């Protein structure tokens, strides 16, 4: 029973942030425009990151949409630890490393792709 409680507590949206977002807009139309701009920005970042992963031949799970891209690794612990040495913080999940594309700019996404590529080359995975 802990999982639903934890998910509702820690994985839910920030009500204060949503209230601030809603209150900063003068109209519903303005808010809709901002939401659309943010969707496009997220799609642009994700497309860029996935193009780097494809170019570097870094495996990742199928991506449709969302805030995260998950890289495929049977044992993600060494990858996460390697990235942390450069202050790159990802999420360790079952057979993968989750990258929060939503919070990163292109320069940071390039850095992550290069570090993962370096990890693969060093470890000969």
Label the predicted regions:
Residues 1-125:
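PLP-dependent class I/II
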């Amino acid at each position: 029973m802990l999982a639903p409680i934890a998910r509702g507590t820690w994985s839910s949206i920030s009500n204060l942030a949503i209230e601030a977002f809603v209150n900063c807009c003068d109209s519903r139309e303005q808010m809709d425009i901002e939401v659309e701009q943010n969707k496009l920005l997220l799609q642009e970042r994700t497309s860029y990151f996935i193009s780097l992963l494809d170019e570097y031949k870094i495996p990742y799970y199928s991506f449709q949409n969302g805030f995260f891209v998950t890289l495929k690794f049977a044992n993600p612990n060494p990858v996460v630890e390697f990235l942390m040495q450069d202050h790159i913080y990802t999420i360790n999940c079952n057979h993968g490393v989750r990258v929060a594309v939503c919070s990163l700019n292109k320069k940071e996404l390039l850095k992550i792709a290069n570090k993962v590529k370096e990890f693969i080359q060093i470890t000969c995975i």
